[in-house]
UniProtKB/Swiss-Prot annotation:
Residues 44-46, 208-210 are annotated as: Interaction with histone H4 N-terminus. Keywords: Acyltransferase, Autophagy, Chromatin regulator, Cytoplasm, DNA damage, DNA repair, Germination, Nucleus, Phosphoprotein, Stress response, Transferase, Virulence. It catalyses: L-lysyl-[protein] + acetyl-CoA = N(6)-acetyl-L-lysyl-[protein] + CoA + H(+). The gene is HAT1. It comes from Pyricularia oryzae (strain 70-15 / ATCC MYA-4617 / FGSC 8958). This is Histone acetyltransferase type B catalytic subunit. The modification Phosphoserine is found at S8.
Length: 468
């Protein structure tokens, strides 16, 4: 083993994060977890040089996410020339607020001073029951709010540790703070002693408003001559805007329970109620977020007649030569539905394609199972499938026109067919995921109804609640 290997530590293992709460006997750990990756801090190799038995314990006070860092090790490398151990304090100070480096006693004293009836900043948008009886709350605030901005400053490091390509948002430029909305997800734990509820931070999302240039109808000359600018302050909220989901994080202990979908759905519903929001977009989503978003949007739109009424026009004939026909799906009604529900064009097209694929006959519908035995398709079923493929190819061509236009006709057709095959598999996977989510939701609802019936049949509801 090389000398350097003796002094190199895997950063993902060395760094442990935890949520803690104070008790009469000291701090108690609510949950602990390790980062998904640490390359934004320690480089591509995710190694920390200069220590043996290194432990970096980053504790967060569960309600307000006040951080505290504790670093321990058995040995530290003695510097030789330019070869020096990683300066962990200096490195972490670039990512955490100064309060994170207070002594442990100061940290414990500070969090003990938090009032028992403390509540997170912002207005309550949603309350729901999670798995195993867990209760959650989603609140909305704004980055211009001091308490909310303080929490964001404390937790932004988590974005780098769990979101591929994640980045900080600026909290120092006061003139743009009110463009940022913040949506907090909290797990609520009722106290067994004083009747209050304890909040545990479970995740959050930041949403940015930007204001596109808009076209306005020409007005008579008199209107321009009499134009008066509004006096006083003019809030950004009064302007037509697009909203962009920027950061979106659910802490690992609260993942895989539908909490991400709940948070996304709440953000979308909030934006949908705002008459000034033109469109809801997402900034550089990763694959996991894309899947969650696809399933959530599909579930939502399938409840809307403006969407479900969109169908493939099977009266259209596909010529063997010449230009491909348009209007496979009514373009006007499709655009009206998209604008009504303020979904970005590409996202709406994808979800519509998924939905239409799910309505194809089983004899022609693409699936993840290659050897599935099905009946021979009829001509009508095959024709509808051909029209669906044409509909998808037309979008793919528009989206990749610059690249595809440089290929000859044969290569262009081959490339489109290859891409279509990948799209079919992707849609089949997402539709299967949506089906599993629907079944899980139905199962959870049935279990909850059964529990409610048992509770109503109890001779002492109060005792049952307290025992729980």
């Amino acid at each position: 083993m090389a000398e350097s290997d003796l002094w190199s530590v895997d950063a993902n293992s060395a760094l442990e994060l935890s949520l803690v709460e104070p008790t009469e006997d000291g701090l108690t750990t609510v949950t602990r977890f390790h980062p998904r990756f640490t390359y934004p801090l320690f480089g591509e190799e995710e190694q920390i040089f200069g220590y043996q038995d290194l432990k970096i314990n980053l504790q967060y006070h569960a309600p307000d996410m006040r951080p505290n860092v504790k670093i321990t090790h058995s040995k530290k490398f003695k510097s030789i020339g330019e070869t020096q151990p990683t300066d962990l304090d200096a490195l972490l100070q670039g990512y955490l607020p100064p309060v994170a480096f207070a002594k442990k006693r100061e940290f414990e004293d500070a969090i003990r001073l938090m009032p028992a009836d403390w509540t997170p900043p912002g207005e309550i948008l949603s309350e729901f029951d999670g798995v195993d009886g867990a209760k959650f709350e989603i609140r909305r605030s704004n980055l211009a709010d001091d308490a909310s901005r303080q929490i964001i400053d404390r937790v932004q490091l988590l974005i780098l540790l769990f979101i591929e390509g994640g980045s900080y948002i600026g909290t120092d430029t006061t003139d743009s703070l009110d463009r940022w909305d913040i949506f907090f997800l909290y797990n609520i734990k009722p106290s067994t002693t004083d009747g209050t509820s304890r909040y545990q931070f479970a995740g959050y999302s930041t949403v940015y408003k930007f204001f596109p240039l808009q076209r306005f109808p020409l007005e008579p000359k008199e209107a321009h001559e009499n134009l008066e600018l509004p006096s006083g302050e003019f809030p950004f909220s009064n302007l037509r805007s697009r909203t962009r989901i920027s950061q979106f994080l659910i802490l690992p202990p609260f993942q895989k329970s539908g909490n991400g979908s709940r948070l996304y759905r709440t953000i979308y519903d909030y934006c949908l109620r705002d008459p000034n929001v033109i469109e809801v977009t997402v900034e550089d989503p990763n694959e996991a977020f894309d899947d969650m978003r696809d399933v959530a949007d599909l579930d939502f739109l399938r409840q809307k007649s403006e969407f479900t009424d969109l169908r493939i026009n099977t009266d259209i004939h596909i010529p063997k030569q010449g230009a491909a026909p348009r209007g496979v799906v009514d373009e006007v009604k499709s655009e009206e539905a998209r604008c009504l529900y303020r979904i970005a064009p590409r996202q709406f097209s994808r979800v519509l394609e998924m939905h239409l694929m799910s309505r194809l006959a089983e004899t022609v519908r693409p699936t993840l199972v290659d050897d599935k035995v099905v009946a021979k398709p009829t001509k009508i079923e095959t024709h509808e499938y051909d029209l669906w493929k044409l509909f998808v190819k037309q979008r793919l061509y528009r989206h990749n026109k610059e690249v595809l236009s440089q290929l000859d006709r044969h290569d262009r057709i081959e490339r489109l067919n290859e891409t279509l095959g990948s799209v079919e598999l992707e849609y089949a996977r997402i539709l299967a995921l949506a089906e599993r989510r629907t079944q899980a939701t139905s199962s959870n609802l049935k279990r909850k109804l059964d529990d409610d019936e048992n509770t109503e049949g109890s001779s002492s509801k109060k005792a049952r609640v307290e025992d729980a």
